[in-house]
Amino acid sequence: MAIHVVNEARRCLHCKKPMCREGCPISTNIPEAIELFRTGHKEEAGEMLYENNPLSVICSLVCDHEKQCEGHCVLGRKGAPVHFSSIENYISDAYLDHLEPEMDPKKGQRVAIIGSGPAGITISVLLARRGYDVTIFESREKIGGVLRYGIPEFRLPKSILDRYQKQLIKLGIKIRPNTAIGRTLTVDDLQRDGYEAIFIGTGVWKPKAMGIPGESLGHVNYAIDYLVDPDVYDLGDNLVVIGAGNSAMDVARTALRKGVRHVSVFCRRYQTAASVREVDYAKADGVEFYYGMRPTRITDDGVYYKKVEMDEEGNITSTSEEQFFPCSSVIIAISQGAQNRIVSTTTGLEMSSHGLLATD
């Protein structure tokens, strides 16, 4: 690993106009981080990455690098881009356990963070360092949100999140696990108890339904529910995954690791929403892909569907008669939305047309 990242760092051209940085959603100064690492200043590189993004080590594993930093690297136009994800992971993983960030004086003001997913963790770190008294309210047993309960271990080791929890506590952040705001406690209760600001970052845990017959049958499940704890599901030997995003890839690859013999992914179109890398990994694991598949109903024995043909612009040119695909179980992975528990129990909050918290 060390030799690999050193060699990758040496490949960086240090462009005057670094396209890799432009491709990063948070404008990470990639050339500077690489140069610090290459010249033996790994600690400074780790500090720089952490200051720009407290979740640097996590992003090094789960970001869509091929569309962002690495996808914009000029070396990728004629060959392989600099694999900054590997460099970032090597630097940030080493830095995480012994970081000593500067802290502002205590302000004596309470802030509540509802949800400990990526947004909740990040804003908790930023506010705690600015002197606020931060409390995280997490509905599940451990922090992480979708990072822990929606991404498989083989993509993001849970031990990294356990290390983050230690760092949060080290910063003076209080964590209340197994506390879902909107049940026993509400946002109104938090305001009553002196929290001067409340950040709601509860994620999108409500699966999107397909609205087809058979969706409520006992062998049909949703991706976001399955990924929370795959070990409690008995999927049989033949699984159909409906959907073609990264979550669908996570489901398919996890199911194979849990003993399912055959996994088939149904894609509505002739390309996938998942990253090329994740699709390649899924194919390498043995997942089979079927394109132009439009499920019409689910039965105890499998999925009925219509096969569509499309032109280059994505317009449907023909639709087949209904056909049958046998399987022992189905997992639907087409999207998720936000739950309305907090909005429905809080005075003055409203939902947007997209099912999210309405803001100014």
Language-model-detected regions and their locations in the chain:
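Short hydrophobic/charged patches on amphipathic alpha-helices used for structural packing
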Residues: 9, 187-191, 231
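Glycine/serine-rich phosphate-binding loop and adjoining beta1-alpha1 elements at the start
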Residues: 22, 26-102, 169, 177, ...
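Beta1-alpha1 glycine-rich phosphate/pyrophosphate-binding loop at the start
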Residues: 27-39, 48-50, 72, 77-82, ...
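A short, basic/flexible loop-to-alpha-helix module at the beginning of a structural domain
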Residues: 93-111, 223-237
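Feature captures the FAD/FMN-dependent oxidoreductase FAD-binding
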Residues: 105, 110-114, 162-212, 296-304, ...
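Short acidic loop-to-helix transition motifs that present clustered carboxylates
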Residues: 180-185, 225-229, 271-272
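Glycine/Thr-rich phosphate-binding loops of Rossmann-like dinucleotide-binding domains
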Residues: 207-210, 230, 273, 313, ...
